[in-house]
């Protein structure tokens, strides 16, 4: 059975983050994740995590710089060091990074060299700290127009070139269905590189049940593949948070 994690950025959005953590536990889940850490009350988050016994599946490095943008190498590496400190305080092993948008007038290959250079430095930090950065391709059609990294093949090639235990892929089944499909094929092709998985219904980014993505089948495929990382629920509930989370559990069989 896949290990599920609730993205608290998209659930109970009217509540403080520490209370959202308590709601995750009350809903019967054992892990949560979030996006950026810099603007959050980390003391309250640590206290709620200790109180509930939940695992922290991952969070974003929150560098303040884009991997694609010229410059910022020192800032990106510093951000990785800072995020590693936060990760250790939360007993979290996975960090998330996105690339940023295309650079106008610049070829894909020139941007790619810059991204690889920055990721080599950041992943060296992660590897030294016993962590793994998960690089996330996103869809450029609905949610992230002009985003640079869009396919699993692109992400896989970068991870292969960087060649570090500190770098893997965040496989988002919502984004990749919109971008390229072939979800189970890509799961198997990149299984050795995948460090985290995200889910949401297609279209709309809502509940998993009734989605264009057959999540019951996808969960079976993930389970059968031997993947042992977390599967994050990164969707906006339309039927109420507790109902949506209970409904998701029915897809596990």
Predicted region positions:
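Flexible loop residues that form catalytic
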Residues: 37, 100, 138, 202, ...
């Amino acid at each position: 059975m896949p290990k599920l994690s609730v993205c608290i950025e998209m659930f109970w959005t009217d509540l403080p983050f520490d209370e959202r953590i308590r709601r995750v536990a009350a809903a019967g889940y054992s892990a949560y994740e979030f996006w950026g850490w810099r603007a959050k009350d980390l003391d309250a988050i640590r206290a709620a995590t200790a109180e509930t016994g939940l695992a922290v599946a991952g969070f974003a490095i929150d560098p303040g710089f884009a991997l694609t943008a010229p410059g910022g190498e020192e800032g990106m590496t510093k951000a990785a060091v800072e995020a590693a400190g936060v990760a250790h305080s939360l007993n979290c092993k996975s960090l998330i990074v996105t690339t940023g948008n295309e650079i106008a007038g610049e070829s894909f290959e020139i941007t790619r060299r810059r991204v690889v250079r920055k990721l080599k430095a950041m992943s060296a930090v992660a590897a030294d700290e016993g962590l793994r950065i998960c690089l996330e391709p996103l869809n450029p059609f609905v949610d992230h127009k002009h985003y640079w990294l869009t396919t699993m093949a692109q992400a896989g090639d970068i991870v292969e070139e960087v060649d570090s235990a500190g770098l893997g892929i965040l496989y988002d089944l919502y984004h990749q269905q919109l971008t390229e499909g072939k979800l189970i094929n890509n799961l198997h092709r990149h299984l050795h590189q995948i460090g985290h998985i995200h889910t949401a219904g297609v279209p709309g980014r809502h509940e998993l049940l009734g989605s264009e993505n057959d999540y019951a089948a996808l969960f079976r495929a993930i389970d059968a593949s031997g993947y042992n990382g977390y599967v994050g629920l990164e969707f906006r509930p339309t039927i109420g948070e507790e109902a949506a989370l209970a409904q998701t559990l029915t897809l596990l069989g």
